[in-house]
Regions:
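Active-site-adjacent structural elements that line small-molecule/cofactor binding pockets in enzymes
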Residues: 1-147
Length: 147
């Protein structure tokens, strides 16, 4: 998990990698913040919990995950929105199609072998649904890859 320095961390890892018998090539696993919902709009609403958490991390006001807030991003100062966006640069937030495209783009951009997803959704049932949508997106991506 190196959200703001993801590409630099990947370059450093690959440049300093030393092959071994067990791992002749680098194996890249990256952490990805993910919020998935049936629609992009609902995912953005649910992501407001993550935005609140990130802002708390950045300002030293750490708390337990808070419930989502309607139009949370609109209430923020431009520099707060920018800081949250920077922190979550590798995040994938959206409905099924957006998530599928976002995961595919992230793998293409990074060459990741594995994605470790974290879904900070306040409601546990909706968190599970978020991960189920991500699993469906992954399955669709795998089905599209030629054997």
């Amino acid at each position: 998990f190196a959200p703001r320095l993801l590409h630099q961390a990947i370059d450093l890892y690959r440049n300093l990698y030393r092959p071994s018998a067990a791992w002749p090539k680098p194996y890249l696993a990256i952490g990805v913040p993910l919020i998935a919902a049936p629609t992009d709009e609902e995912a953005e609403f649910l992501a407001s919990s993550t935005y609140q958490r990130v802002l708390g991390i950045l300002t030293g006001d750490r708390r337990l995950l808070l419930p989502p807030v309607e139009n949370y991003a609109a209430r923020l100062q431009p520099q707060e929105r920018a800081a949250i966006g920077d922190f979550l640069a590798a995040a994938v937030i959206g409905g099924p199609e957006t998530v599928q495209a976002g995961l595919a783009d992230l793998v293409r951009e990074t060459g990741a072998n594995e994605l470790m997803l974290v879904s900070d959704v306040y409601d546990p049932a909706l968190r599970l649904r978020s991960l189920e949508i991500a699993a469906q997106a992954h399955a669709a991506l795998q089905a599209a890859v030629p054997a």
